[in-house]
Swiss-Prot record:
GO cellular component terms, semicolon-separated: cytoplasm
Entry EC number(s): 4.98.1.1
Keywords associated with the record: Cytoplasm, Heme biosynthesis, Iron, Lyase, Metal-binding, Porphyrin biosynthesis
Disulfide bonds: none
InterPro entries: Ferrochelatase, Ferrochelatase_AS, Ferrochelatase_C, Ferrochelatase_N
MF-aspect GO terms: ferrochelatase activity; metal ion binding
UniProt binding sites for Fe cation: 193, 274
Purpose: Catalyzes the ferrous insertion into protoporphyrin IX.
Domain of life (superkingdom): Bacteria
Record GO biological process: heme biosynthetic process
Subcellular location: Cytoplasm
Name under which the protein is recorded: Ferrochelatase
Pathway(s) it belongs to: Porphyrin-containing compound metabolism; protoheme biosynthesis; protoheme from protoporphyrin-IX: step 1/1
Length: 322
């Protein structure tokens, strides 16, 4: 008889604790110090980061956070907490939250599950498409947490779910709901968070996952390549990142006759600064200034019922397939 108790740890990237320059600086410092994210020589990168990038970017980014901040706090944290609550209710088992950077820490999430008697932990990084910059960074934090622990709990870590049928179904449903509310646009653009092209050249499978997700979503929606496409946003620095860039794609669509655009970001499980400000506001401005007439931002899956059902299915399959 198996008397082991299973718990679930949902993990996302993280967020500043407040929309202030100080809080944003602290968060960005931790995030951009991770070699999984920026692998530049430390003797070059650290002085550049602390002497130039953080002093300039932190106040600017803080103002952007202020524009999307919710009454309950950071959107990413608010939606992540709702996901935890909904998944816990659906599974009737302990579910905790951890962030790779910032609060709540992955460490505190694991400790919470252990305090509830969990000796088996299923770790679900909320990154549908695997990347060294996201999923692998979660693994690093887990390994760091247990570096000096004599007896490890049983871990199962979800690698990706870019082609999970319920994930694709949830994405398609969110697009259809947008069509019902706002009308159907001429084109659906799937905008994924970008990573340096060099990472993919060195073996990261992120781009392949993004392409497959887009392909499956197109099939689910019954759209042709003339009606749906993909691009990459949030480029940072001068290095070449995955292309096509979202900003350049938006400039090219209207001149091709696409005047009404629906835009979605399948790589984000919860709405955050990159979706609520960059995708919803900045990208809209680019499209409209380039000749577009209608721009519809489709929110992330957040705590949508189908999204929670997908998480529950992933967890349940790991429990009952053992």
């Amino acid at each position: 008889m198996n008397n082991k108790k299973t718990g679930v740890l949902l993990v996302n990237l993280g967020t500043p604790t407040a929309p202030t320059a100080a809080a944003v600086k602290q968060f960005l410092s931790e995030f951009l110090h991770d070699k999984r994210v920026v692998d530049m020589n430390r003797f070059i990168w650290c002085p550049l980061l602390h002497g130039v990038i953080l002093p300039i970017r932190a106040p600017k980014v803080a103002k952007l956070y202020e524009s999307v901040w919710m009454e309950e706090g950071s959107p990413l944290l608010v939606y992540s907490q709702r996901q935890v609550k909904a998944l816990e209710a659906r599974l009737s088992m302990p579910v905790a939250l951890g962030m790779t950077y910032g609060e709540p820490r992955i460490k505190s999430g694991i400790e919470s599950l252990e305090q509830q008697g969990c000796d088996e932990i299923i770790i679900l990084p909320l990154y549908p498409q695997y990347s060294r910059t996201t999923t692998a960074a979660v693994f690093d934090q887990i390994a760091k947490q247990y570096k000096t622990t004599p007896v490890l709990p049983n871990f199962t870590m979800i690698h990706n779910y870019h082609d999970h049928p319920l994930y694709i179904k949830a994405l398609a449903n969110s697009v259809r709901q947008s069509w019902e509310r706002n009308g159907k646009g001429d084109y659906v653009l799937c905008s994924y968070h970008g990573i340096p092209q060099r990472f993919v050249d060195n073996g990261d499978i992120y781009a392949a996952h993004c392409e497959r997700t887009t392909e499956l979503l197109a099939q689910e929606l019954g759209l042709t390549s003339e009606q749906i496409g993909m691009s990459y946003q949030s480029r940072f620095g001068r290095e070449e990142w995955l292309k096509p860039y979202t900003s350049e794609t938006l400039k090219a669509l209207a001149p091709k006759g696409i005047k009404s655009l629906d835009i979605i970001s399948p790589a984000f499980s919860s709405d955050c600064l990159e979706t609520l400000e960059e995708l919803s506001e900045e990208c809209k401005e680019i499209f409209m200034e380039s000749g577009g007439q209608k721009y519809t931002f489709i929110p992330c899956l957040n705590d949508d019922e189908l999204h929670i059902e997908m998480m529950a299915d992933i967890v349940s399959s790991k429990i009952f397939n053992k």
